[in-house]
Amino acid sequence: MAMSKMKKIVTALCLVGVGVGALWGSQWIMHKTSTPEFCASCHSMSYPQQEWEGSSHFANAKGVRAQCSDCHIPKEGWHYVKAKFIALKDLWYEAQGKIENKEKYEAHRAEMAQRVWKDMKANDSETCRSCHSFDAMELSKQTKLAKQTHTEAQTNGQTCIDCHKGIVHFLPEVHGDQNTQKSSAVQGGTLSDGSAIFATEMVKATNDKGNEVRLMPYAELMQWKVDGDQIQGTLHGWQQVGAEAVVYQELGKRITLALMDEDARNHVQVLKIVHDAVTDSDWKEISVAVNVAKEKMTSDLTTLNQYGNQLNQTQCSGCHAAIGADHYTANQWIGVVNSMKDRTSMKKDEVRALTIYLQRNAKDMAKQ
């Protein structure tokens, strides 16, 4: 009887020992597989390692270094265990040679980045917040832009990864020729009787005297008719007195419709003159008859807007979450786009189209 009791005690102690050993072993394995040395032991991880070593998260004036696990593995709880198990797929991919060289790595960079961004968005940038906290920020010591952005982020419930993409690892390239995407999406020459038509891009037009009028993307013509491969229509807009070279869509809002040469400015019909208190200047409401190539105009405003939104989503989401058009006023969008365009691969025509799309759908504009 005593031996039976002793046997049970020994068995229980052995089970406890096995449990403790398994728990300690699991913790040891999880810890060792979270080190930069382990992460970079796979050949495919040498590429992100080089990017990390060139970033401020590796070396900085403060002497603080963020390890791989600091950003990619939540510190505790279910998210921690989940991250470790999901990481097993990386070992499988390494064995299969999915990203065995630089070319394959680049081919999958966007896919990998989107997965990480999605996870960080879902957990409210948990790993970022283990070091960075809104509560600990002294906004008064930040730059004007950082202070404004962080204040808006707190108000709107945004999370770190919404804006802070590409600060350690290179951003994925936006593949595909945007002009090719546009030509397949916005076909000029698609016209519907009785509806307004819009320029698909910046295009040269002329007035009835042959003077040049350059229409901007989204420039609207009314009372139009087809004449062979040309369209005759009426452009309606506003000019600021003293700066008549530019025709704007609305009074006081600098949404460019057209640029006119010196002779063309003298051949417009002035409908009325209004003093605008905001700009403290006089504005002329005008109309002008123009001739333009049929292939450069469309009635399909929906598809044209989809193209503008596509530019916003693909080009402007590399560094931060794409900002909705109704976030800023029409005039504010000019400065916002100009301050960020050099960080994208957009060409001048694309910048122009994006700016006007955002302006037309700004928060102080009626739904377009």
UniProtKB/Swiss-Prot annotation:
Binds 5 heme groups per subunit. One of its GO terms (biological process) is anaerobic respiration. It comes from Haemophilus influenzae (strain ATCC 51907 / DSM 11121 / KW20 / Rd). Heme 1 binds at C39, C42, H43. This is Cytochrome c-type protein TorY. Pfam families: Cytochrom_NNT. Belongs to the TorC/TorY family. The chain crosses the membrane at residues 9-25. Residues 26-368 are periplasmic. It is a single-pass type II membrane protein. Heme 4 binds at C160, C163, H164. Residues 1-8 are cytoplasmic. Heme 3 binds at C128, C131, H132. GO terms for molecular function: electron transfer activity; heme binding; iron ion binding. Keywords: Cell inner membrane, Cell membrane, Electron transport, Heme, Iron, Membrane, Metal-binding, Transmembrane, Transmembrane helix, Transport. Heme 2 binds at C68, C71, H72. Heme 5 binds at C316, C319, H320. Part of the anaerobic respiratory chain of trimethylamine-N-oxide reductase TorZ. Required for electron transfer to the TorZ terminal enzyme. PANTHER family: CYTOCHROME C-TYPE PROTEIN (PTHR30333), CYTOCHROME C-TYPE PROTEIN TORY (PTHR30333:SF3). It is found in: Cell inner membrane. One of its GO terms (cellular component) is plasma membrane.
